[in-house]
């Protein structure tokens, strides 16, 4: 069983699945005064959808941290997908707590879910220093390789979310309040089925 983990995106995607023009069309906005707001909301919607499904829509670097390796040499179930590459595994060595790179791991990236197996040399994970809450760090690159690879229902979910938030905007609200709308309103009910489609078929 894979230990509990934390996930952080350390390098964000360089492009977004939905363009500013598409966002403005969804919200029926013809002026440019709210361009920056709509772009930020598009990013927020993408991030919320990724968090809800575990599916990274576009190329990004992700850090996964755990307190320990799985017992008995079991593989680690990577919590995000699709995974393009595992670029590094480090751990706090049991003997002295020193951060140590682990070589020789086996990544089964086309598995559902993607798995990371221990070094083939002995088939076991090393012992870690239990004083550290995040003794194990896995760095990986995940996501689709281009905006064209993003499923249409993921793009539609982003548009639905931003359009929904736009309806909460109102007139004369404080800019700080407007910025906080995505976190307060969450994803609309119409996104639920679309998110289900994102998780029904992962590979192949």
How should each PLM-predicted stretch be described?
Residues 1-204:
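Divalent metal-cofactor coordination and adjacent catalytic microenvironments
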């Amino acid at each position: 069983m894979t230990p509990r983990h934390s996930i952080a995106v350390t390098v964000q995607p360089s492009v977004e699945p939905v363009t500013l023009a598409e966002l403005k069309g969804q919200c029926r906005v013809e002026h440019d005064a709210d361009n920056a707001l709509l772009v930020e909301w598009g990013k927020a919607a993408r991030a919320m959808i990724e968090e809800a499904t575990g599916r990274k829509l576009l190329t990004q670097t992700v850090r996964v941290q755990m307190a320990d390796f799985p017992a008995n040499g079991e593989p680690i179930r990577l919590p995000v997908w699709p995974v393009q590459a595992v670029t590094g595994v480090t751990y706090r060595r049991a003997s002295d707590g020193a951060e140590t790179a682990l070589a020789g791991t086996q990544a089964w990236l086309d598995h559902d879910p993607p798995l990371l197996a221990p070094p083939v040399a002995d088939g076991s994970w090393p012992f870690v220093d239990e004083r550290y809450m995040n003794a194990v760090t896995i760095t990986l690159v995940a996501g689709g390789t281009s905006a064209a690879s993003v499923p249409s229902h993921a793009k539609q979910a982003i548009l639905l979310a931003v359009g929904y938030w736009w309806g909460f905007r109102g007139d004369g609200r404080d800019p700080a309040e407007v910025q906080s709308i995505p976190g307060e309103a969450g994803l609309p009910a119409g996104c639920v089925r679309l998110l289900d489609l994102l998780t029904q078929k992962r590979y192949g």
